[in-house]
Amino acid sequence: MSQSVESRVRAIPDGKICDFIDGKLRNDPPEEYVRQNIERRLVLELGYKPENISIEHPIKIGSSTKKVDIAIFRDGRSHVQDNIWVIIECKRDNIPPTDKQDGVGQLKSYMSSTPNCEWGMWTNGISKEVYYKVLTDSQIHFEEPNDIPGPDGDTKFIDRPTREKLNAATDDNLLFSFKICHNHIYTTDGLQKQPAFFELLKIIFCKIEDERNVPHELEFFATASEKSSPDGRLTVKRRINKIFSRVKSKYSAIFPSNDEVNLEPRSLAYIVGELQRYGFLNTGIDVKGKAYEEIVGANLRGDRGEFFTPRNIQRMAIDMLSPKSGEKILDPACGTGGFLVIAMNDIIEQVRGQGSHLGDAYAEALRDQIREIASTSFFGFDINPDLVKATKMNMV
């Protein structure tokens, strides 16, 4: 091993984690998992510079000193309390937003005591609240936008993103969004876990269909003002119902023609607002696969001893098999379809690579070949009919 490589090797003790922003070793309780994913999202998705982010930054509240989980500063500003622009609080998933000590009230008190802090976010990995602080006649009140802005402060695309502004999800942040949406359906609409999951899948299909509907403008969005009014929520529901009609036409084997989105307008608008920032088509296959398969496993695992193979083991097994175009692949206990999806994507990439030199004239023929391979080469069985349906969705 060379000296340059050897100098970068660092042993991390059990129970510790190396912080993504400042490289410090920290204890690794459940809330740290949430914070590390948020840190990655700030840098890798939103484009913040690590040097403008401070972890466990001290602030004064009256005569006491508190530490905020994440403080963000404008570019080039010194790291003092008066220059904090965004505060983010990260909690473990058993602390609700309404918690008197560690809930959103804590975040609001931090924002109120920090004069130039405009934005705040509170999350426990299954719930998320975003606030924008407004000062009117010496009174502070908090608006509730869909998300915090990037480092340029531009809020235009928070309400209505364009395809060019959709973010590719990183690490477990898409999984966080799925959990947040599912938890919202479960608690707001009163649905049990499985029905709530299938309602969420309808919305995910609508999101993907909307992204594919080129060159038309995106219709999968909910503005903050729409989310805050009954009429606005109904407007969102009408848009999503329009998209879902196209989904049912394309995927009649999954969604019957009389199927509907059975969510209250308030809940639907919240979920759309949470998912709209991500580009599902440009998010990495492994990120999407892990998010989908974990949310499926958490909600559809029955009492028949199902065990879902970890994704890295799936990846290793497919690499060992090295499937080729023209082969038929069967998984007799397919679960969520993870093995099949990885194999399918590997073969599709092989075909694309073989045809990459042919140019645009053969692009349509190549797409036809890929569609034929995807529809005729992969098969799965499972004892759980709900998992069979989930596998179909995963492969689509």
Residue ranges and their predicted role:
Residues 12-23, 171-191, 271-276:
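Short amphipathic alpha-helical segments and their helix-coil junctions
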Residues 307-396:
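Conserved S-adenosyl-L-methionine
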